[in-house]
Amino acid sequence: MSSPPPARKGFYRQEVTKTAWEVRAVYQDLQPVGSGAYGAVCSAVDSRTGNKVAIKKLYRPFQSELFAKRAYRELRLLKHMRHENVIGLLDVFTPDETLDDFTDFYLVMPFMGTDLGKLMKHETLSEDRIQFLVYQMLKGLKYIHAAGVIHRDLKPGNLAVNEDCELKILDFGLARQADSEMTGYVVTRWYRAPEVILNWMRYTQTVDIWSVGCIMAEMITGKILFKGNDHLDQLKEIMKVTGTPPPEFVQKLQSAEAKNYMEGLPELEKKDFASVLTNASPQAVNLLEKMLVLDAEQRVTAAEALAHPYFESLRDTEDEPKAQKYDDSFDDVDRTLEEWKRVTYKEVLSFKPPRQLGARVPKETAL
């Protein structure tokens, strides 16, 4: 049996949990961190700076047009985002030397250490930590939304946190295809806005605000706020707290089926949020009442939520970084697999690091 060709100059090969990795020699001490539906992540040390980084390898990104489209979109979104509360790219590389050989690429990002889901399992969060974490979520969302991107699947596991309680949003804007279309992966609907769960209408950026409300409530009480067993059960759980919506809201629903269903529901009174969120401060309750609104048009935006008195002590007068609009017209073009490979290869080669390589990485991107 012929042995594989030697690693590309400046690269080395290593097997990590039965998968061959071929990475740039500057990234040492590969350690598996986790894996999901689309890829695996290792931590490594950037030998130029001594900083720990996370390297993501996508599983066979070019196995189908659907996977290729997703890989291309993930790469372009990561290249686009430059905000301290949104994960961005430090580097991207391929061990393949030509377009004809191009089958894999690796995404290098700041290593954060843990995620909010794991953090909540291990400790009870104090009010000031909750405040700081929610503030960062909203700052990141304000930036993502200004770029014209909707996250769509915000949950504790998508919020990376380091030991200084600094937070970055992961996996934004990727949940565009139905998840089952990709891998049959089961999605967590507990944090999803009702209009997403039930496909009520074209949804807007405030779907992400609903998710922040669910996450914030869970941080306060230590319990998942709406834990439904299926779509309709999820809606019932939500309406036990929000109450059934008024007729004018039901009229806005685009689906006749959804309208009929909603009209047939027994009327439920809105609960007093303070009784649901024991231990929450009045300002926290007031903010949550503005986020967890069934009617998406009545929900606060990220910018409005940031202006809420709850964040008075944290508000930063410095100018927020301005988001450039993300042009997604490239993402929805119909392309052959070879064309997806070609445009992705071009994106990999055109990457410019966010700052001088070799410079000390600032605190917010390092553990």
Swiss-Prot record:
The modification Phosphothreonine is found at T183. Activated by phosphorylation on threonine and tyrosine. MAP2K3/MKK3 and MAP2K6/MKK6 are both essential for the activation of MAPK12 induced by environmental stress, whereas MAP2K6/MKK6 is the major MAPK12 activator in response to TNF-alpha. It catalyses: L-seryl-[protein] + ATP = O-phospho-L-seryl-[protein] + ADP + H(+); L-threonyl-[protein] + ATP = O-phospho-L-threonyl-[protein] + ADP + H(+). One of its GO terms (biological process) is myoblast differentiation. Its cofactor is Mg(2+). Transmembrane segments: none annotated. It is found in: Cytoplasm; Nucleus; Mitochondrion. ATP binds at V33, G34, S35, G36, A37, Y38, G39, A40, V41, K56. The keyword Ubl conjugation applies. Residues 27-311 form the Protein kinase domain. A motif (TXY) lies at residues 183-185. InterPro entries: Kinase-like_dom_sf, MAP_kinase, MAP_kinase_CS, MAPK12, MAPK_p38-like, Prot_kinase_dom, Protein_kinase_ATP_BS. Keywords: ATP-binding, Cell cycle, Cytoplasm, Kinase, Magnesium, Metal-binding, Mitochondrion, Nucleotide-binding, Nucleus, Phosphoprotein, Serine/threonine-protein kinase, Stress response, Transcription, Transcription regulation, Transferase, Ubl conjugation. It holds the Pfam family Pkinase. The keyword Magnesium applies. Dually phosphorylated on Thr-183 and Tyr-185 by MAP2K3/MKK3 and MAP2K6/MKK6, which activates the enzyme. Serine/threonine kinase which acts as an essential component of the MAP kinase signal transduction pathway. MAPK12 is one of the four p38 MAPKs which play an important role in the cascades of cellular responses evoked by extracellular stimuli such as pro-inflammatory cytokines or physical stress leading to direct activation of transcription factors such as ELK1 and ATF2. Accordingly, p38 MAPKs phosphorylate a broad range of proteins and it has been estimated that they may have approximately 200 to 300 substrates each. Monomer. Interacts with the PDZ domain of the syntrophin SNTA1. Interacts with LIN7C, SCRIB, SYNJ2BP and SH3BP5. Interacts with PTPN4; this interaction induces the activation of PTPN4 phosphatase activity. The TXY motif contains the threonine and tyrosine residues whose phosphorylation activates the MAP kinases. This is Mitogen-activated protein kinase 12. The gene is Mapk12.
